[in-house]
Amino acid sequence: MQVNEYFDGNVTSIAFENGEGRATSGVMLVGDYEFGTSEKELMKIVSGKLEAKLPGEPGFRAYPAGSEFRIDANQKFQVRVIEPTAYLCFYS
């Protein structure tokens, strides 16, 4: 396992690998963030609420707990975290 912190500690993730492949589990505190991808990602919102502006979309869309979204490799996307949010991200 590897622990990573981003944005002055406001985003923390733990990277791991299991039978489903590589993944990170993490928490994002309230704030606005921009992320870049190096490979395809499936982001699942476990708890909390955020809004994301994905590549090619005209604006932000709400993603509450239980929802998910996909991002292709080599893309940037923006996130507005409305309340502290836990996520699980799978890479492929």
Swiss-Prot record:
<dbReference type="GO" id="GO:0016154">
    <property type="term" value="F:pyrimidine-nucleoside phosphorylase activity"/>
</dbReference>
<dbReference type="Pfam" id="PF06865">
    <property type="entry name" value="Ppnp"/>
</dbReference>
<dbReference type="GO" id="GO:0047975">
    <property type="term" value="F:guanosine phosphorylase activity"/>
</dbReference>
<dbReference type="InterPro" id="IPR011051">
    <property type="entry name" value="RmlC_Cupin_sf"/>
</dbReference>
<dbReference type="InterPro" id="IPR009664">
    <property type="entry name" value="Ppnp"/>
</dbReference>
<dbReference type="GO" id="GO:0004731">
    <property type="term" value="F:purine-nucleoside phosphorylase activity"/>
</dbReference>
<dbReference type="GO" id="GO:0009032">
    <property type="term" value="F:thymidine phosphorylase activity"/>
</dbReference>
<keyword id="KW-0328">Glycosyltransferase</keyword>
<comment type="similarity">
    <text>Belongs to the nucleoside phosphorylase PpnP family.</text>
</comment>
<protein>
    <recommendedName>
        <fullName>Pyrimidine/purine nucleoside phosphorylase</fullName>
        <ecNumber>2.4.2.1</ecNumber>
        <ecNumber>2.4.2.2</ecNumber>
    </recommendedName>
</protein>
<comment type="function">
    <text>Catalyzes the phosphorolysis of diverse nucleosides, yielding D-ribose 1-phosphate and the respective free bases. Can use uridine, adenosine, guanosine, cytidine, thymidine, inosine and xanthosine as substrates. Also catalyzes the reverse reactions.</text>
</comment>
<dbReference type="InterPro" id="IPR014710">
    <property type="entry name" value="RmlC-like_jellyroll"/>
</dbReference>
<keyword id="KW-0808">Transferase</keyword>
<dbReference type="GO" id="GO:0004850">
    <property type="term" value="F:uridine phosphorylase activity"/>
</dbReference>
<dbReference type="GO" id="GO:0005829">
    <property type="term" value="C:cytosol"/>
</dbReference>
